[in-house]
Amino acid sequence: MKSLESGLVRLFQLRIQNIVAKLKEGDKAPDFTVRDGEGQTVRLKDLRGKKVVLYFYPKDDTPGCTKEACSFRDSFAKFKQRGIEVLGVSFDSEAKHKKFAQKFDLPFRLLADTDRSIAESFGTYGEKKFMGRTYMGIHRMTFLIDEKGKIKKIFNQVKPEEHAEEVLAAFDE
């Protein structure tokens, strides 16, 4: 079972390699206004002067997405120490985000991109293929945004359990 799971994960990762985000490192990050799981308005422009991790994930409370969120949770003190704001983005509603954050004690904000506008502007929404099925969805990607609002790094391939430490290392480069 584990080798089947590993094979499926690798197949999915290979598919991700073929995604070309329309944004590049060094580009200005697109601004957005959206609500988080607590119903609070979040504007990217209001975070200028801070480093931001904007991580896109497919769905709350699913195995890979939970591992990734818990990875950020477990490393959150390190992000906070460095003054880095962590924001998760999916198509889930504010209510689902609130429930997910409470269930796993997530200390960062989850953004409800219910109209897909953020994912589309960052190039993370598109065709996906998994287990012989083709569908449209959000690709697991992460953007590191510097204090001036520029994209410092884009992660097109993400290992959910290790991702937070990988992101921290990239900010330290």
What residue ranges belong to the model's regions?
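Chalcogenol-based redox active-site neighborhoods
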Residues: L4-E173
